[in-house]
Amino acid sequence: MTHQHPYHLVDQSPWPLTGAISALMMTSGLILWFHTNSNHLLLAGTILLLLTVINWWRDVIREATFQGSHTLPVNTGLRYGMILFITSEVCFFFAFFWAFFHSSLAPTVELGVSWPPTGISPINPFLVPLLNTAVLLSSGVTVTWAHHSILTQNRTEAIQGLFLTVILGIYFTGLQAWEYYDSPFTIADSVYGSSFFVATGFHGLHVLIGTTFLFICFLRLITFHFSNNHHFGFEAAAWYWHFVDVVWLFLYICICWWGS
């Protein structure tokens, strides 16, 4: 029977269930890792999450690109969904900034009535953090270049721009890992270490997710999945990447520069 409406009624799928199970395994595994030094459940949850993501994305790409299920109303719904998702992420990071300023604007006696707390040697904001800022802002330029090239049907420049964006994302992650390795304090060193590593660590996780998202778009672009008027998968990745850029600017200004 043919449905006389433009909406996509998805088939039954196991991926929401396996995704929820993997989230439970990863969070429980993280707690076990912290308390018992056993990471088996965490690794199993991560593997299940990767399998879920790969298969779910495969299904969505098939429905969108090969079955034509993503009509204009469906695309509009996906846009609203992505906007709501990014809004929820804004609230997520707002909580980290709240925790940071709650501790830094009125340091307690336990912290030595100073910020950074007594005994903490902060990271120089004009070395690796400043380079990271330049790298991430440059990646924002290259992803915009790629988007403009898709709109103007310049496929070669779109591929070049997206490839550069992925490389810059990987470079940022490498620099962040190096900064963590050389850090003079740890996540256990007072509320300064906790707020610094949790906020920048979750941002780094979002950079990894965004880089993966853009890499999938890069593979789709070179296999002719995008046109100048139908490329929301790329647009969603670009929105997410710009969000990651803006969050890093606030992290750099507030935590790396002002907080040091």
From Swiss-Prot:
CDD domains: Cyt_c_Oxidase_III. It is found in: Mitochondrion inner membrane. Keywords: Membrane, Mitochondrion, Mitochondrion inner membrane, Translocase, Transmembrane, Transmembrane helix. GO terms for molecular function: cytochrome-c oxidase activity. GO terms for cellular component: mitochondrial inner membrane. The keyword Acetylation does not apply. Its EC number is 7.1.1.9. The keyword Translocase applies. It catalyses: 4 Fe(II)-[cytochrome c] + O2 + 8 H(+)(in) = 4 Fe(III)-[cytochrome c] + 2 H2O + 4 H(+)(out). The chain crosses the membrane at residues 14-34, 41-61, 81-101, 126-146, 158-178, 196-216, 238-258. One of its GO terms (biological process) is mitochondrial electron transport, cytochrome c to oxygen. Its main location: mitochondrion. Gene3D superfamilies: 1.10.287.70, Cytochrome c oxidase, subunit III, four-helix bundle. It is a multi-pass membrane protein. Pfam families: COX3. InterPro entries: Cyt_c/ubiquinol_Oxase_su3 (IPR024791), Cyt_c_oxase_su3_dom (IPR033945), Cyt_c_oxidase-like_su3 (IPR000298), Cyt_c_oxidase_su3-like_sf (IPR035973), Cyt_c_oxidase_su3_a-hlx (IPR013833). Component of the cytochrome c oxidase, the last enzyme in the mitochondrial electron transport chain which drives oxidative phosphorylation. The respiratory chain contains 3 multisubunit complexes succinate dehydrogenase (complex II, CII), ubiquinol-cytochrome c oxidoreductase (cytochrome b-c1 complex, complex III, CIII) and cytochrome c oxidase (complex IV, CIV), that cooperate to transfer electrons derived from NADH and succinate to molecular oxygen, creating an electrochemical gradient over the inner membrane that drives transmembrane transport and the ATP synthase. Belongs to the cytochrome c oxidase subunit 3 family. Component of the cytochrome c oxidase (complex IV, CIV), a multisubunit enzyme composed of a catalytic core of 3 subunits and several supernumerary subunits. The complex exists as a monomer or a dimer and forms supercomplexes (SCs) in the inner mitochondrial membrane with ubiquinol-cytochrome c oxidoreductase (cytochrome b-c1 complex, complex III, CIII). This is Cytochrome c oxidase subunit 3. It comes from Patiria pectinifera (Starfish).
